[in-house]
Amino acid sequence: MFDIGFSELLLVFIIGLVVLGPQRLPVAVKTVAGWIRALRSLATTVQNELTQELKLQEFQDSLKKVEKASLTNLTPELKASMDELRQAAESMKRSYVANDPEKASDEAHTIHNPVVKDNETAHEGVTPAAAQTQASSPEQKPETTPEPVVKPAADAEPKTAAPSPSSSDKP
């Protein structure tokens, strides 16, 4: 892969031994070997995926060629039935797009608040200057009506205490 000869590998090993020392050199070699292993596996994976995609593309191209060749040899009855099937499939696709379950689900989970909508319509003609003058106007207190004072029932009638039997009353 790297086209390194034995003498060059020995030279790299000696330089690594001098720079890193005998204690850190094995750890560095293991780390570099792990990186090389990961890069090789990544390259192999990418290569396999590209090969599969190319095979799939070639298969699809050959399938299209066969379909075109077979369509020219079809009888008019088969062509008519294939056209009907295509139209049915298109209408199903259109109806599915029109009744998209994700949109219906989103609509079902949406909270509609008419108060906020009415609030927005109430503030349509208000400019920032008008809002500022309204905010800086003196505070108005709401009118209060005095509430009648109601006496609790416990205070209205005095209670008479009935003698309760106690443990000292026993004969």
UniProtKB/Swiss-Prot annotation:
UniProt membrane topology term: Single-pass membrane protein
One GO biological process term: protein transport by the Tat complex
Presence of the UniProt keyword Nucleotidyltransferase in the record: no
Keywords assigned by UniProt, alphabetized: Cell inner membrane, Cell membrane, Membrane, Protein transport, Translocation, Transmembrane, Transmembrane helix, Transport
Family indicated by similarity: Belongs to the TatB family.
Functional note: Part of the twin-arginine translocation (Tat) system that transports large folded proteins containing a characteristic twin-arginine motif in their signal peptide across membranes. Together with TatC, TatB is part of a receptor directly interacting with Tat signal peptides. TatB may form an oligomeric binding site that transiently accommodates folded Tat precursor proteins before their translocation.
Name of the protein in question: Sec-independent protein translocase protein TatB
MF GO annotations: protein transmembrane transporter activity
Annotated region (Disordered), positions in chain: 117-171
One GO cellular component term noted in the UniProt record for this chain: TAT protein transport complex
Organism (species): Escherichia coli O6:H1 (strain CFT073 / ATCC 700928 / UPEC)
Annotated TM spans: 1-21
Compositionally biased region (Polar residues): 130-139
Keyword match Phosphoprotein: no
